[in-house]
Amino acid sequence: MRNRSRNLVLLALTLLAQPGNGLAADDFAAGRRIFLEKADCAYCHGWAGDGAGQGQSPGGAANLRASRLDRDSLIMVISCGIPGRAMPHFDDQAYTDRRCYGTTEAELGGRVPPFPPSTTLPRRDIELLADYLIAKVIGRGPLTREECMETLGERVRSCSDYPAITGP
């Protein structure tokens, strides 16, 4: 009985360590770090993914919170960017073969998405980023106070600008 209780406690602790979406805590943290720091997606998309990037960004970034992209589509956009738009490609082999939208750099005639300013991402990082976005950003609608505090911390006053979650 004692072992069973211990095992149940361990299971409960393991489940509590998960971000609540099936994504392992380490993978979740890695995806978030890639979004906020390594790939600096927040520069254009905003720290909340709402398209409100920093003032120096090119502007016009997608509001990921309103997006309906699935995981495979996100991986394609992150890897290949969007031809003719400011969205960069993070796969260093993008457009060297037909992996990106079935086309090559030569066929696009100069409309290849810009190369990221300082980094490319290995496939695993692209997948971690997509998984993080699916878990915490894509299709989530307007930012809530609770999400703001989860991301920025409890003591950030600007989080009070967002509506609190209300429910039954």
Regions found by a protein language model. Name each.
Residues R2-V9:
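Bacterial N-terminal signal peptides that target proteins for export
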Residues V9-Q18:
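Bacterial N-terminal signal peptides
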Residues Q18-A24:
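Sec/Tat signal peptide C-region and signal peptidase I cleavage site
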Residues A25-A29, E37-A39, W47, R85-P168:
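Flexible coil segments in periplasmic/lumen-exposed cytochrome c-class electron-transfer proteins
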Residues Y43:
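Short, cysteine/histidine-rich loop/knuckle motifs that typically chelate Zn2+
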Residues D50-G51:
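Short, non-ligating residues that shape and space the ligands of small metal-coordination modules
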Residues Q54-Q56:
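Conserved catalytic-core motifs of eukaryotic protein kinase domains, centered on the activation segment
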Residues N63-L64, A86:
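Conserved beta-strand positions that form and line the central face of beta-propeller blades
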